[in-house]
Amino acid sequence: TEFFTGRIDFPVQPSLGVKEAMAARVVPHQRQLEWQKLEMTAFIHFTVNTFTGLEWGTGKESPAIFNPTSLDAGQWVRVLSEAGMKMVIITAKHHDGFCLWPTKTTTHSVASSPWKNGQGDVIRELKDSCEANGMKFGVYLSPWDRNASCYGDSPAYNRFYIEQLTELLTWYGKVDEVWF
């Protein structure tokens, strides 16, 4: 019996039965197996709307309301590790557009908040805590941004978004997983 990894090259005009038989013999790549072995990943949604009580923000929230009094990313990671999580993904930016890192692309970020006098970086703290505790690290970067004035202008917004993604993927070392 032939097994397939990667892609399947179907014969010209195969029957549904042939497609099903071939698809049933697809086996995962090593990287896919490693991802499956993680078993549980934590997804942290912590943003400016943690302080508004809303699920989704409007993008008009003042960064001044983002002022956690005892944020301890190390404690988060220790608890998640004790619970069996092997990776944590954080919402670096949700639909409200508020960035948990001091991005150069917008003032709608931790750099404009009173938290740590605008010098805080939730992404850095969490990434460093993950490294210290042997946990994998990932980010979610919302494609929708209700704060960005260029949203809706595809070329301009694409440049804006790619710059944010580039910051996240170059400022923090290895990022194990990215969600959009």
Where are these regions (language model features)?
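Mature catalytic domains of secreted/periplasmic carbohydrate-active enzymes
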Residues: T1-F180
